[in-house]
C-alpha cells in the first residue's frame, strides 16, 4: 500500500468514526434523558420504558457500528491496498 | 408516645415495606427481562435459519463465520441490555463496552483467514431483524 493510500485511509477512518458517532451520541443522550425523566415520573412503567429505550439504543448504536466497521475495514482489511 | 411510634412502624406502609417494593420492581424488571429473552429467542431462531441457508449455499466456512458473528451480536446485545438496565440505578450513563465486540470481530476476521469478514458482519447484524420484529409486535 503506497503512502497516499495509507494516509487517505487513516483520515477516512477517523472521519467515519468521528462523524458517524455525532448523531447517535446526541440521540442517545436525549433518549436517555427522556427515559430517566419518564421513569422518575411514572415508576410503574419502568419496564416498558426500559424496553423501549433498549430497542431505541440498539437502533441508534448500529449507526455508530456502521462507521466503526468502515473505519476498521479501511485500517485492517483495506480493499484499496494494492 | 413511644407506643404510638412503635405502632406506626409496625403498620403496613408501602413506602417502608421493603418486600412489597421489591416485588413491584421485580415485576418491572421481569417485563424488561422478558423483552430481552424474546429478542434473544428471535435472534437464535434467525441465526439457526441463516446458518443453515449459508451452509447450504456458500459452504461451511461462510456458515461458521455467520455463526461467530451472530454469537458476537447476541453478546453485544446482552452487554447493551445490561448497560440500559443499570441506567438510572447504579450508573448515570450507558457504557460503551459493547462497542468492543464488533471491533474484536473485525480484528479477528482480519487476523484469522478462517473467519470471513462479510458473513461475520452479516451475522453480527442478525439481532436487528429480531429487534424490528419485536418492535413491530409491541402493543
UniProtKB/Swiss-Prot annotation, chain A:
Keywords: ATP synthesis, CF(0), Hydrogen ion transport, Ion transport, Lipid-binding, Membrane, Thylakoid, Transmembrane, Transmembrane helix, Transport. It is a multi-pass membrane protein. One of its GO terms (molecular function) is lipid binding. It is found in: Cellular thylakoid membrane. Pfam families: ATP-synt_C (PF00137). The chain crosses the membrane at residues 7-27, 57-77. F(1)F(0) ATP synthase produces ATP from ADP in the presence of a proton or sodium gradient. F-type ATPases consist of two structural domains, F(1) containing the extramembraneous catalytic core and F(0) containing the membrane proton channel, linked together by a central stalk and a peripheral stalk. During catalysis, ATP synthesis in the catalytic domain of F(1) is coupled via a rotary mechanism of the central stalk subunits to proton translocation. Key component of the F(0) channel; it plays a direct role in translocation across the membrane. A homomeric c-ring of between 10-14 subunits forms the central stalk rotor element with the F(1) delta and epsilon subunits. This is ATP synthase subunit c. It comes from Prochlorococcus marinus (strain MIT 9211).
